[in-house]
From Swiss-Prot:
InterPro entries: RNase_H, RNaseH-like_sf, RNaseH_domain, RNaseH_sf, RNaseHI. Mg(2+) 1 binds at residues 13, 51, 73. Coiled coil: none annotated. Monomer. It comes from Halorhodospira halophila (strain DSM 244 / SL1) (Ectothiorhodospira halophila (strain DSM 244 / SL1)). Residues 4-145 form the RNase H type-1 domain. This is Ribonuclease H. Endonuclease that specifically degrades the RNA of RNA-DNA hybrids. HAMAP family: RNase_H (MF_00042).
Length: 149
């Protein structure tokens, strides 16, 4: 999905019907005029796990290090990776209130993948008419639909 130079745009979203419940994740990748869509789901999960999984799947789809602009509607993902992660690691995967970090397995995988690329993390408000975010949301819901069909 990557070429020598340039920026890969990744638009990610997670969805859950019930929380916990069946969930899905969706990714729209764009490099220049090339687009690729990815999606999947899990029968019993949470919305936050699906948001993290979407970001992970986006970065896993890239076959070499590159610059990525990753756009999510999840403040949990954006703030987690840009603000909270270093503190969690310093505290042995504990929050500031000394509780275990939820979804540690996914945070560790996302941290590992993000270190391989140069990632700019962007946030957009969900369900606010952002075309690529709406597409990622539709893909996440497709992931759920195929599970429960």
């Amino acid at each position: 999905m990557t070429e020598q130079r340039g920026v890969v745009e990744a638009f990610t979203d997670g969805a859950c019907r019930g929380n916990p419940g069946p969930g899905g994740w969706g990714v729209l990748l764009r490099y220049g005029e090339h687009e690729r869509e990815l999606y999947g789901g899990e029968p019993e999960t949470t919305n936050n796990r699906m948001e993290l999984t979407a970001a992970i799947r986006a970065l896993e789809a890239l076959d070499r290090p590159c610059r990525v602009v990753l756009t999510t509607d999840s403040q949990y993902v954006r703030r987690g990776i840009t603000e909270w992660l270093e503190g969690w690691k310093r505290r042995g995967w504990r929050t500031a209130s000394r509780k275990p970090v939820l979804n540690q397995d996914l945070w560790q995988r996302l941290d590992e993948l993000a270190a391989y690329h140069q990632v700019d993390w962007h946030w957009v408000r969900g369900h606010a008419g952002h075309a690529e975010n709406e597409r990622a949301d539709a893909l996440a819901n497709q992931g759920i639909d195929e599970l429960v069909a």
